[in-house]
Every structure is written in structure tokens, then in C-alpha cells.
Amino acid sequence: MQDHIYVKGARENNLKNVDVTIPRDKLVVLTGLSGSGKSSLAFDTIYAEGQRRYVESLSSYARMFLGQMEKPDVDYIDGLSPAISIDQKTTSKNPRSTVGTVTEIYDYLRLLWARVGTPHCPVCGKEIKQQTIDQIIDQVLELPEATRIQVMAPVIRGKKGEHAKVFEDARRSGYVRCRVDGIAYDLSEEIKLEKNKKHNIEIVVDRLVIREDIARRLTDSVEIASNLSGGLVVVNVVGEDRDILFSQNYACEDCGVSIEELTPRMFSFNNPYGACPACTGLGSQLKVDPELIIPNKDLSILEGAITASGWSNIKSDGIARMYFDALAKKYRFKLDTPAKNLSPEVMDVILYGTRGEELTLHYDQPRGKGTLHQAFEGICNNLERRYKETQSDAMRRELEDCMSECPCPTCQGRRLRKESLAVTVGGLDIDAFCRKSVTQALDFVDHLELTEVQMRIAERILKEIKSRLGFLQSVGLQYLTLSRGAGSLSGGESQRIRLATQIGSSLMGVLYILDEPSIGLHQRDNDMLLKTMQDLRDLGNTLLVVEHDEDTMRAADYIIDVGPGAGVHGGEIVAAGTPEEVMNTPGSITGEYLSGRRKIPVPRERQKGNGKLLKVFGAAENNLRHIDVEIPLGTFTCVTGVSGSGKSSLVNEILYKKLGADLNRVKVRAGRHDRIEGEEFLDKVIDIDQSPIGRTPRSNPATYTGLFNDIRELFASTQDAKARGYGPGRFSFNTRGGRCEACQGDGLLKIEMHFLPDIYVPCEVCKGKRYNRETLEVHYKGKNIYEVLEMTVDEALPFFENLPRIYNRLKTLEEVGLGYVKLGQASTTLSGGEAQRVKLATELSKRSTGRTIYILDEPTTGLHSYDVQRLIEVLQKLVDVGNTVVVIEHNLDVIKTADHIIDLGPEGGDGGG
């Protein structure tokens, strides 16, 4: 086997025909400035080719179901293994995914509870034993005399297929009737079932009327049904549409509650046999939230305090006003009283109705006027009812503005049906186990006491559970619980979970490509992560890690530095070799920072702030322990702490959502806290995250920052455009008129290729220029609109230097280090760090009131030390004009330049907050 991977002539995105040699079975770090072409080399070239070759080896039928990669723009790659990419973008937003399901630990837990669990009665909690035929007969005979019943054998329960053989066997055995998915059939008719749907089939063994003398016949029928279905009998009470399930397997003698034999699917909240029927296994339900109906309690009803759909129109002839007038008269309150001064009784009547008491309603409509007498259902009940009844998606979305998620009242947020939760191992049900942190769960498994027989059954299952929990601990995630939703994890956490899952599979000879696994990790947890990556390497795998973290670079076997600049100024290999060799390579910015020749300076003086404070009292969301926090306004504040210590809970869940609701009038529910003081010194809150600035190729930095409007107006003001009668709309590629209609302004046409990836080809009519010929004939300083959009920010600065509005916006893009980005570059091709800096530039170009608070969650993600320095300068500019910046960060360079630090801890999870 070759000892290296050789890439020849890589030209993807901004790569300049690069040749590179990567040693196999080593920890290799790819580094370089943001936008220099690291991801293009690692993900778009090496991973794409490795994945493509693997998928091409499969059958054409299998290829239909797998996303096909395009062949990357590269001459050839030699010595490539199957590639597995672990990046940050693929966090599951599915509400059904939890840490347990993603790591597959939950599958082993379901098996453990099904095989060695002790069932209890869900009603009285008593341990359940199996039922005998005699016990079943006694219970059936307790039904009232003359009750008509059917004794049925449930032969198929929730299995896919047409099940033709089941019906054939039943006919041969002389049975006449059956019930399929709740519908009765005659076995003489042809029963066609859908092959890919799950079905329930019960064969009718006997039909009886309850009398004293039927015991013997009933016994025979129950025995036959039990033998047919392997121990289960269904007694259907005719006329009541009620089924009683009996099991020779498990039932409670006192309550008569039967449960079927324990199977792993009973413990799955993604399966109808295990999921709570009320919330279908989600653990939460959408409920109308009074806080969102009346977001601002300082207003009165007449001033529009109630913002709920259908109740916000307070015009004197409206339906809502008719009800409010009647309520005010009956319960003696004034409609101009601020909501916060209304009594609890009055608020209760407005929200939850008059509970049957009638109101006298006076209506005066164009159709006539008169008086009505009727009860009022209350705004909350009205919204709930309309939500259940409406068929319109738009109406649903409008009503959801007044709703928030709350734990399901049936299962208390535990996702499973009560029968499943009544099964215990070591005294715990499966949900209680999943609510333990990884450390506590490991401790529980280590000290689990089982009988000798149980131990023999559970031995291999426990071994798998222990090893997987151990891997989660080894990547610094010991504070997570298995029941935590995958959607609530940060990018770094979800990436390390998938890393732990990969170690669990213990493959060798694989090429792993990782995208900044150290994100969101405190320096303390970094060593654990490095050890994990070295373990993966020692198994015989090659690790290619895109990373800026200094510790990781020093621990690497080999470093490849891509650069020297970003965008068009990058795309070359500046240095490659061991960390020592890179440090001594002239022209490598990475080498200069690693060797200490370049450093980010500590500021000479720190901002004192404006003397005002923003105070949070009693913060208690997630693991926060009723803490009080002060943030000095007009400063650059850094919130630090180990992973899982509560930083995001404090900043994103409480601070951002509360300020968003109060200052920006956004309908969100903030995390648990007592109160916040100091909001009056602020006028808005802005969260600058790394989400894309647009989801389609039509959005670009020019459209996002507002530059494009100014550029279109500039073109519309030229003599040529005026003579032709063109307005600014003519120069938009999103509307008819100026754009090329063949590609509708995309510049590309999508050609669907079945079994092969879709191909995008430049439009033949406009040659990829997005506009029609007439529009492109209008020039400004010798360039048409397409050529202007193709300029980079650096090229556009001298071109527009006499136009202050455009020049100032371009200057801010250049200041945040995006000089290499084209004005019309599709937003889908920007990295997270680049998208975040486009947003920062947009903020910098606005007129500042000096009363804004900016919130950033780990802004150094994807940034090289050189870029971090630029970022710090930009954030200082926001602070210099009086704004407040709050940053969650682990990067020591950012922390040392902050004016104020809030450190949470001391540990993650239960040990933090």
C-alpha cells in the first residue's frame, strides 16, 4: 500500500492548479487564512473524489438513494482511501434525534431494557408476572352478562408486507372472518394490502355472548387464539368498539392491565408501539402561550396589548371589540388600563373565557344591529381550537407566533408510553437513565447488579454501552445527557459526537476529514480531543484536519499551509512539512504565528464603558444556578468557561431572547430568569452568527449589505439608461425586464441526470452573465453591471472612490478582511466565517446610535490568527462608537483583548452554572 496520497492539479474554487502530497496514517493539519482554499482542497476535492469513487462502485439501484458527488476539478488523486467527512454543517435539526440516538447508544439501551427489564403495572406500579389461561378466562367472565364478544388471535402486529400467506393459512384452517387494521373482512373475499405499509391482522376464532355456561367453549377458543399468535389474545367487546389485550406473557393481577412481551421497539419513541400517543414521541407539544399573546404589558387593550391573530383589531365595529366591550361591562374594568394593572381574575377571563357564564354582546354591523347572549371561550382556547381545525398552512404559521413548546402533559416530556416507562433495569426506567450525564451513566452501568442469568444475557450489550459512553467522555462531552436533543448542540459538540461514534466503529484504513473539531472546546478539554484523534490515527487511519488551533498544529505529524492570502490571493501551498519545518518557512503567516514572531498584541488601554450596567438577576435556564450577572455597557465583554458550563444558556437563551422580545418586539420566550435591569440604555439587540446570508445563489454580499441598490441606482442615472428609459429595476436579476429570461437571471441552467449528479451549465443565451443584451449595453466608466458584480471588493474600491455611499460600504467589507470576495459571489459559496463578517460589515456601515448590543457566539470559528486580529479590530470599532459587544469565546487571543470577562463554571453540565 502507498504511504502517501498524491493530489495533482487541483483547481476547485480558488485553488491554482495545486499539487500536494499527504502522508498516510498520520495526523495532518490543513491551515491557512479564512478563504484561502483549505476547505476547497479538503472537502471539495479530496473528500468529494473519495466519496465519488466509493459510490461509483455500488449498483445503479443503490446510487439512486445516495447523494452523488460531482467529479472535482482535479487531474488525478493517487493513493486515496474511502473518505468519511465530519464537518459542522450536518447537525441534525430533527426534533426526534437525541444524543442517544445519534451515537446509537440508545439502540443498545432498548435491547437491554427489552431483555433484562422488569415490567411493572403502569397503574399501580406492582411488578407484573405472566398470565395463565385460567386467569384470562376469569377476567373475561367478569364482563356484564349478555355482552357480545369476539375472541381474536393477533397474528400480525405492525409488520410491513402483503401477508397473503397469512390469509391463505387461515382459510385452510377453516376460519371465516378476520380484522385488518381495524376493519372487518370476510376471508372468502380477496384482501389486498399495501406492501410498504405496516399492518395489524387479527383472525376471529370465536364469537360468543357472555353467559355462565360458556366457560368451556371460551377456554378452547382462548387456547386456540393463544397458540395461533404466540401467547396473545384480543377480546373485542362488540358494540363498544373496545379491545382487551391479554397476554400469556405479562399482566397485573390487581388492575388487570396486560402488556405485550418486551421488545426493543417498545422503548423506541420513533415507533408507534413505544411512543407516547399524545405527542407521538416528541416529548413536547405546541401550546398557546399567554406571554406571547400580550408581549408588552405596559400597553392597554385599546393600545393594542393583545397581538394574537384575530384579536388585535380593536376598531369599534370589529368582532374582537364587541367581546372586549361586553367583558369590560360585566367584569367592571376599563379597556384603557395597562395590561399589567388588570386583576388576575380579569386576565383569566380574557385568556381562558367565562366558563359557561353568558355575556350580553351588542353588535352594530352593516348587515344590521342587535343583541346576542353567549359565553366567551377565551383567547387561549379560541386560538387552540382554530389551530386544530384549520387546514391552511399560512393560518397555522400565524397562530404558531402565539405558541411555544411545552412538555407533553401525558408523558411529562419523557417521550414514551406509560407501559414502556413502567419497565426498569436496576430500579431505573429507560428515560431516567437517559437523563443522567455521560459520567453518571457510566457509573450506573459499572455498579449495576443483575442475577446470574440476566448477566449472561446482558454481558455483551453492557460492553457496547460502556465503550460508547467512554468514547463520549474521551472527546470532552462527559457533561451531556443522552436525552438531550441533537438540534440544541453546538457545531463543535455535534462534530465531536460523530467523532466518538466513528471511534466506536473502530475501522482502519479510512481517510477522516475533520472541520475544526476544537470549536467550542475550552483549552482544558482540547488535550482529550487530541488524544482521541491520535487514537484514531494509531488504529491505522489518515486524519486530515482543517484547523487553526495552535495546540493541534503543534501535535500534528504534518502541516500543510494554504495561502498566502485569501480568495484570489490564495489557493497555493505556502508550506508543507513538520511543525518545525513550517515555522522556518519564509512567507508562511502560520509559521510566523507558531514560532511567536507574530503575536496579537494586548491592548494598551481598555475601554472603561459608559458607567451604565445591564444586570441579569436569577438566571436559571438549563444548568444555571440562579446567578446574577452584570455586563458593563459600552465595552467588549467576553463570556468564557469550559464546554457545557452554561455560556449559551446565559447569553443566547436568556439575554438575547429577552432583549429581542423587549427591544426588537420579536415573539420569543426567554430562558428562565427573574428579571433584567438596564434595558432602557439600549435600543436594539443584534445577533451576528455564522448562518448563511442567503440560501440561494441569488443572494450575494452586494444584495445583503445594500450595495446592490446603490449600484443599480447609479447605473439607472447614466445618460445611456435615461435615454432608454431604464429604472433601477432594469438592473436586477430577480425581476423580469433586465434579466436573461432563458435562465431567469441565474446565469446557470440545471440539467437533471438520473443516476448521476445534476449538472449546472452556463446559460447559452447570456453566457452566464445573468442579464439580457440591452441591459449589458449600459456602461458606467466602461463597465457594465455584470462586470461590476464580477469585481472583487479590492478592485471595486478605486473604481467607486468618488461615490461616498458605495465607497464607504465597500471600505467596511475590506476592513473585515473580505477584500478578495467578488461583489456578486453567490452566498452559498461563502464559509461561515465569511458570512459572519459580511454581517459585521453591514452593521459597521450603518449609522450608529451607540445604544446597540451585539451578541456573537464563537466568532473565531474558521478564522486564522491573522483573521482573528482583523476581527478584534472590527469589534473594537463597534465599541468605540459606544455600542456593547458580548462574545462567547474560548480563543485566548480574543479573551486577552476583552475589556470585561465573565467566567462560568467550574465544570460542564451539573457541575457548572
Pin down the residues of each PLM region.
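Conserved phosphate-binding elements of NTP-dependent enzyme cores
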Residues: 1-912
